[in-house]
Each structure stands twice: as structure tokens, then as C-alpha cells.
Swiss-Prot record:
Belongs to the aldehyde dehydrogenase family. AstD subfamily. The active site is at 244, 278. Keywords: Arginine metabolism, NAD, Oxidoreductase. The gene is astD. Pfam families: Aldedh. InterPro entries: Ald_DH/histidinol_DH, Ald_DH_C, Ald_DH_CS_CYS, Ald_DH_CS_GLU, Ald_DH_N, Aldehyde_DH_dom, SuccinylGlu_semiald_DH_AstD. One of its GO terms (biological process) is arginine catabolic process to succinate. Catalyzes the NAD-dependent reduction of succinylglutamate semialdehyde into succinylglutamate. It is an enzyme of class 1 (oxidoreductase). One of its GO terms (molecular function) is succinylglutamate-semialdehyde dehydrogenase activity. Pathway: Amino-acid degradation; L-arginine degradation via AST pathway; L-glutamate and succinate from L-arginine: step 4/5. PROSITE patterns: ALDEHYDE_DEHYDR_CYS (PS00070), ALDEHYDE_DEHYDR_GLU (PS00687). This is N-succinylglutamate 5-semialdehyde dehydrogenase. Its EC number is 1.2.1.71.
């Protein structure tokens, strides 16, 4: 087997064996050995050796490589979509959009580098002020499973454009997609050692995060893991740590004339990607009146008809399996805890086969649950909270340590003005799903949702550091010298 990619060559891992499985069938998709601590060390040292030449190359040369990568991603879009669907359970219609996003990210990242970093000059009385940006060196990229191609790409592309060398540790649940992506980078002509792949589970990640020769760590994943990394690097200011994590995201339903439009956007917010987007709505605030009752009745009715099926089924389902049998079981267990604490099931989640990752979407009214836990249930589990006044809804919506996304569905523009002024989140949408985001805008949020804005336009900010210079081509004595100096 050749599980790892180090120094421009595929190599066998020397750590424990592991495998990924199609969550919709249970069949093995990828099998191999993880990277041991020694393998990780070789990968980091390979990146360090490659860094000097890569960072010394021109921005145009680096951009030419990433543009070739984008072109190859477009050519191989169907193969990528198939790999994403097979390994994650994501329906092909959605996997194709992920592959397209991988290619689209390149031009946005190039634009971001030029506009937010790059080089700028301004004249001074006695010279020229120059602002340049320099790469950090060797950066580790940790990728998630829900978008195993697109989200790591949101770190890797801007890091490479800035001149960094990368060691990529993908999710152990999607190693096959990572291997295919790295092969495309190789075919695009990326020099040996500039991008290295270390496959593996927890121990591989620990070895990479603990390596003393990395200059930065860029992470997209769970808040729990990101918080551990934040604690780990708390005493190491020399490490650039960029975190994009999850959210307990609120969606507030206000007065609307088009109930079906509100229901559609709520379903998209809560259940797209089987609820496995960090921006999915987890808490849905519904007015405690007749209009709220009508909304809930229609929301429950339409949700009950959502199709769930295999990634390559024809016709395509709206939802595929969640990432694993374990994830499915945890979601069902979370539902049972909420029901035991007083929640009312408007639509109960079912895992029809305990050996597979398929679950049906759930709608639970948790209004009467005391001390509701502030946690992200990463799947199709929507919690309904009835409210009396709009200010009450806002107060409860902000009652979270997270701050990734939030949304308001309402016809009244005055409510929107109040909402966007009051809500605490990094992505705040009006009459659009909570998981709708522009690649040309910051992606992320405050609190336990992260500290930087990975995966989009602002990623350039943490991939390079500013270097300020005052320059003069000719060495000259000043017209006057400071008091106390004699020449």
C-alpha cells in the first residue's frame, strides 16, 4: 500500500491499520496503515526542505500551479464527486457541488492574496515604505469529514499561494478523498515536498500537532478538538493557530406571508447534508401563536416526506447517510436524552438499520426542557423553541458559547434591522438558509466557533505575516543630525 505522500512520492505508512467505510452500505472504501510519529517527522522535514525554493518562487509561478490544480479538478469533477459520495454518504448531486467549489476557491484565493496581502509601496520624504507579506514556513492542515475536499482546500490553496509548505492530515473517515486530491496536486506540477499527506487517526494527529518544526496549524473540525488545540498552543505564541469550528446555530421564524418558503429555507438550514454542515440551524425559534402552529404543522409535514438513501441512488435522495454508524447512534442517543428531559417529538428520528448510517430527520420541541445543553448535535436533529416576544427569541438565540451562523425568516425589515444589530454570530442571513455563505466573504464566527476566518476570502490573513520596510536605494547622510552627535 502507498497511503502517505512524502517528498513527492507515495509511501507506505508504518503505523496501525485503519479503514474508511461507505456509511450507506458498510463496505470498505479505503484501507491502509496510518502514519507513525516517524512518518510524520519525515513529512515535516520534507516540507521544511521544500519551503525555501517554493517561498522563493514568484507569486505568479505559485498561482500557475494552483490554477492547473483547479483545471484538473474541473476535468475530474465526476471522479471526485464519486469518491466524496462513496466515502461520506453524501448524495452525488451535492458531492458535485463540493467538487465545483474546490475549483472555484482558487481564483477567490488568488484575488484575496493580492488584495489583502501581497506587496504595497508608498512614497516617504526620505525613501519608500514597503509592505510585504511573508509565508510562515511549514503549516499543518487538519481537514474534516463533512466536506473532505472543499474545506481542507480552503486552507491548503491560500497557504500554497502565500509560499508555505504544507503537511495535510485529513479526517480518518475520508482518507480516500484526500488521496485523490493530493494526486491532483501532484499532476498539477506542485514541486516535491511542498504538500505532504499523512493519513491516520488520533495518534497521527497528535504527532503532527506536537511536532516542534511546524510554524502553523490550520484546523476545521469539532469545537472540542479545536479547544484542545487552543489549550495546547496557549503557551506557544510562535505558532499561528487558525480554527474554524462548529455552532449551536439559531434560526428565528418571524411573521411571514409565504409559509412554504419559510419551511423550505428551514429544511435547507437544518437538514442539508444530513445536518452535517457547521452552519446548519440547530435551534429553531417559532412564535408561540397560531401562525407558529401553522408553520410547525407544515414544517413537520414536509420534513416527514424527505427522502433518505444511498449516495448514488436514482432518483437522488435529499439526504444520504451520516458519516458513520457511530455518528448515527450518537444522534439517536442525543434524541433520547432530550426526550427523557422533557422534549416532545414532533417527528422522531429513526435509525432503521443499526449497521448503517441512515437516520431520518427529527424535529423535537424542547421548549420545556430545563437547562438545555449548549452543544452541537452534528446531524439532522432540529430543536424547536417556542417564544412569546421577538426580544425573548433574540435573548435565547444569543444564549450560547458559539457564534458561527444565525438566520431570520421574516417579512418585516425593521425586525431584520433589530436582529442583525443584536445577534452575535459571524454569518447572519435574512430570508436565506443559515448555511448560505459567499466565498468572497469571511467564513467563521466568534466564541467557541473559532478564531480566524478559514475557507474563504479572509484566509489570506493567517497564511502570511506582514513585513514592513522603509527603503532607500542610496545611502546618504541626513541634512541634519540629532543633538549630541558630531561628524
Amino acid at each position: 500500500m502507498s497511503e502517505l505522500f512524502i517528498g513527492g512520492e507515495w509511501a507506505a505508512g508504518t503505523g496501525p491499520a485503519f479503514a474508511s467505510r461507505n456509511p450507506g452500505t458498510g463496505a470498505a472504501v479505503w484501507e491502509g496503515n496510518s502514519a507513525s510519529a516517524d512518518d510524520v517527522d519525515r513529512a515535516v522535514r520534507s516540507a521544511r526542505r521544500a519551503f525555501a525554493a517554493w517561498s522563493a518562487s514568484s507569486v505568479d509561478e505559485r498561482c500557475a500551479v494552483v490554477r492547473r490544480f483547479a483545471a484538473l479538478v474541473t476535468e475530474r469533477k465526476e471522479a471526485l464527486a464519486e469518491a466524496i459520495g462513496r466515502e461520506t454518504g453524501k448524495p452525488l448531486w451535492e458531492a458535485r457541488t463540493e467538487a465545483a467549489s474546490m475549483a472555484a476557491k482558487v481564483e477567490i484565493s488568488i484575488q484575496a492574496y493580492n488584495e489583502r496581502t501581497g506587496e504595497k509601496r508608498s512614497a516617504m520624504a526620505d525613501g519608500t515604505a514597503v509592505l510585504r507579506h511573508r509565508p510562515h514556513g511549514v503549516v499543518a492542515v487538519f481537514g474534516p469529514y463533512n466536506f473532505p475536499g472543499h474545506l481542507p482546500n480552503g486552507h491548503i490553496v491560500p497557504a500554497l499561494i502565500a509560499g508555505n509548505a504544507v503537511v495535510f492530515k485529513p479526517s480518518e473517515l475520508a482518507p480516500g478523498v484526500a488521496a485523490l486530491t493530493v494526486q491532483i496536486w501532484r499532476d498539477a506540477g506542485l514541486p516535491a515536498g511542498v504538500l505532504n499527506l499523512v493519513q491516520g487517526e488520533k495518534d497521527t494527529g497528535i504527532a503532527l500537532a506536537n511536532h516542534r518544526q511546524i510554524d502553523g496549524l490550520f484546523f476545521t473540525g469539532s469545537s472540542d478538538t479545536g479547544t484542545l488545540l487552543h489549550k495546547q498552543f496557549g503557551g506557544r505564541p510562535e505558532i499561528v493557530l487558525a480554527l474554524e469550528m462548529g455552532g449551536n446555530n439559531p434560526l428565528v421564524i418571524g411573521p411571514v406571508a409565504d409559509v412554504d418558503a419559510a419551511v423550505h429555507h428551514t429544511i435547507q438550514s437544518a437538514f442539508l447534508s444530513a445536518g452535517q454542515r457547521c452552519t446548519c440551524a440547530r435551534r429553531i425559534f417559532v412564535p408561540n401563536d397560531a401562525a407558529g402552529d401553522r408553520f410547525l404543522e407544515r414544517f413537520t409535514e414536509v420534513t416527514s416526506r424527505i427522502t433518505v438513501g444511498e449516495y448514488n441512488a436514482d432518483p437522488q435522495p435529499f439526504m444520504g447517510a451520516v458519516i458513520s454508524v457511530r455518528a448515527a447512534s450518537r444522534l439517536v442517543a442525543a434524541q433520547e436524552r432530550l426526550l427523557a428531559d422533557g422534549a416532545k417529538a414532533l417527528l422522531k428520528m429513526e435509525q432503521r438499520d443499526p449497521k448503517l448510517g441512515f437516520v431520518t430527520p427529527a424535529i423535537l420541541d424542547v421548549t420545556n426542557v430545563a437547562n438545555r445543553p449548549d452543544e452541537e448535535h452534528f446531524g439532522p436533529l432540529a430543536q424547536i423553541i417556542r417564544y412569546g416576544s421577538f426580544n425573548e427569541a433574540l435573548e435565547q438565540a444569543n444564549d450560547t458559547e458559539f457564534g458561527l451562523s444565525a438566520g431570520l425568516l421574516a417579512d418585516d425589515e425593521a425586525l431584520w434591522a433589530h436582529f442583525q444589530r443584536t445577534i452575535r454570530a459571524g454569518i447572519v442571513n435574512w430570508n436565506r438558509p443559515t448555511n448560505g455563505a459567499s466565498s468572497g466573504a469571511p467564513f467563521g464566527g466568534p466564541g467557541r466557533s473559532g478564531n480566524h476566518r478559514p475557507s474563504a476570502y479572509y484566509a489570506a490573513d493567517y497564511c502570511a505575516f506582514p513585513m514592513a520596510s522603509v527603503e532607500s536605494a542610496q545611502l546618504q547622510m541626513p541634512a541634519s543630525v540629532s543633538p549630541g552627535l558630531q561628524f
